[in-house]
Amino acid sequence: MTAQTLYDKLWNSHVVREEEDGTVLLYIDRHLVHEVTSPQAFEGLKMAGRKLWRIDSVVSTADHNTPTGDWDKGIQDPISKLQVDTLDKNIKEFGALAYFPFMDKGQGIVHVMGPEQGATLPGMTVVCGDSHTSTHGAFGALAHGIGTSEVEHTMATQCITAKKSKSMLIAVDGKLKAGVTAKDVALYIIGQIGTAGGTGYAVEFGGEAIRSLSMEGRMTLCNMAIEAGARSGMVAVDQTTIDYVKDKPFAPEGEAWDKAVEYWRTLVSDEGAVFDKEYRFNAEDIEPQVTWGTSPEMVLDISSKVPNPAEETDPVKRSGMERALEYMGLEAGTPLNEIPVDIVFIGSCTNSRIEDLREAAAIAKDRKKAANVQRVLIVPGSGLVKEQAEKEGLDKIFIEAGFEWREPGCSMCLAMNADRLTPGQRCASTSNRNFEGRQGNGGRTHLVSPAMAAAAAVTGRFTDIRMMA
């Protein structure tokens, strides 16, 4: 039998029908639903007189539009309130396996809530009307975002139409240095292959450095796969995966658990499996990263200087660099560790889990927010993350440092709620995108790890966390 990649196994086990041109009907196991991309889909079902094909495949929460402060005042923005209220009504009418509404203890960012509830399991196909659905590939699952019309199609048929992507292996060999996190690995990879490097591919991450990551680190890495242009990102199942899933609310139990684990252990690329493309990187080459421009690929290690567009020979790239520097208000040659910040945001589906908050708290402990830093927002990814952080006293560390301890939600990752930048504000952010206006009109976003963000908060500028022992 031909050796298969993990992607081959996941894809082939979910093909319902294949046409001559390679288009397939792909069966979907888990559908994650939030308030932004679901209203039109539910409305389409109503107009056609249809019901959900499988109610028990749907897990839902409100996250994009929910405020992360002053919950006693409710949702003030009328459009945001309408979307959240509409989700409430639609779930009550159509049903779901689980629904965590606004202010529920389990509510949170869909890509944080799903895994912590055990709604994401190895071997599944997982879709959501959100581009960062690739996060769930960390479990040895095939996960990717879909558009609103596909949301409706999945609700009605439990399938999507798709064509198989090419396969790519990105291996990081060796051991990561102290102070280097999964976020740094993700940004480094994107810096090396570019934001189009993974276009048309399903990416499997492998190598010693990847296997050493926790599940939360793997989720961060797979979350960022889309920023390299990939359709999906995934990590093979190992004991780390199985240990994380065990005893989660929606994980199998008893004999079903034993059978599931037996199957899950097969979710690895076979020896000799051939990928369409491979990249290999050395973990020793990766340092703490900071983006300097308006694309995740515009990234360098903290010891670098802002690049000079004049040294770029490609005229298209040179023009892009010039525009980025103008928007970001930076001058070529400026050391990254001399760039001051106005705002710090620690949160998002990339970096708002308990390990992320622990990393940030370790830096913030016994330190204070720098005088030039206007605000530091700490936004846990879910109510359960918030609860755990408070049990560990992390909230007290943040508050004593002068940071804001917020309620769960997508928050300042994107300007769809009350948390946003104003024109010209420079933000050290643990989110996944640094596009123009992503965090607010005219806002300037620098992507970093949680520890690097916390370091910027207490020093007032980008700082190598390895210098803060």
UniProtKB/Swiss-Prot annotation:
Heterodimer of LeuC and LeuD. Catalyzes the isomerization between 2-isopropylmalate and 3-isopropylmalate, via the formation of 2-isopropylmaleate. It catalyses: (2R,3S)-3-isopropylmalate = (2S)-2-isopropylmalate. GO terms for biological process: L-leucine biosynthetic process. The gene is leuC. Pathway: Amino-acid biosynthesis; L-leucine biosynthesis; L-leucine from 3-methyl-2-oxobutanoate: step 2/4. Its cofactor is [4Fe-4S] cluster. [4Fe-4S] cluster binds at C349, C410, C413. It comes from the Bacteria. Binds 1 [4Fe-4S] cluster per subunit. InterPro entries: 3-IsopropMal_deHydase_lsu, Acnase/IPM_dHydase_lsu_aba_1/3, Acoase/IPM_deHydtase_lsu_aba, Aconitase_4Fe-4S_BS, Aconitase_4Fe-4S_dom, IPM_dehydratase_rel_enz, IPMI_cat. It is an enzyme of class 4 (lyase). Keywords: 4Fe-4S, Amino-acid biosynthesis, Branched-chain amino acid biosynthesis, Iron, Iron-sulfur, Leucine biosynthesis, Lyase, Metal-binding. Belongs to the aconitase/IPM isomerase family. LeuC type 1 subfamily. Its EC number is 4.2.1.33. GO terms for molecular function: 3-isopropylmalate dehydratase activity; 4 iron, 4 sulfur cluster binding; metal ion binding. This is 3-isopropylmalate dehydratase large subunit. The keyword Iron applies. Disulfide bonds: none annotated.
